[in-house]
């Protein structure tokens, strides 16, 4: 990193902090942005929170970290956007950008000539991915999603990118991590360009709990320490992530009312009832059973369940860790 950071017409001198709004070109929308250019040379960490506007703990954590961290505590440069999907945030909309109905996380790398979601993705991928050395995408369960904390790292790019991403995922204070084989999404696209990346899931169901915010702040501090960017001590961890494999994303076969029998974080046995879909008169339409023994990472807690809704995500815990 040079003495001065220049990005999107902004100039941030070494040893200074900038808190401002970043305009999305050809729109009236501006993203809250914090850039902390540390007093000493080092890596650049890019953090996005609120790509989905209803996922609150990561947004609140990024806001508070941007307020509290000072340049004298940072080696390198910390860039945070909070929230990226500012329109969805104020509208309290789950998943989508209200102006175009698109899932922002599904349109990367974006396009500057299309709609707001595409322009936002392009702004990030074209201006910020190239200057970053590591990327963290902060998520939660959305308004209709309850989850147990876990982290994704990309498994599709080069072995070197996967190894770097996984090494950072391992410093988080959570029980599980997942090697993603997907190619879509902001962090997977970033990894495909050579940028080591992770996606963290913590909190959800439209809640913004103090304990989730604080845990998320500890996550980011641990990452900063891992990247040798942070000079302040971090709290000791209670957990070290273990790999969860063979993920099953159970979809609703029909529209109906979902009554779940399990919760995120539960262990289930093969053949165990996960839940059932009824009609609006309470008559059971379909009962869903676990296809394998494993841990529940995610449950839809909502009663209303349109066809295709992801009801449960669960997988098997890897018996041995490659790095243990």
Indicate residue ranges for each PLM-predicted region.
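Structured catalytic-domain cores with a bias toward divalent-metal coordination
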Residues: 1-324
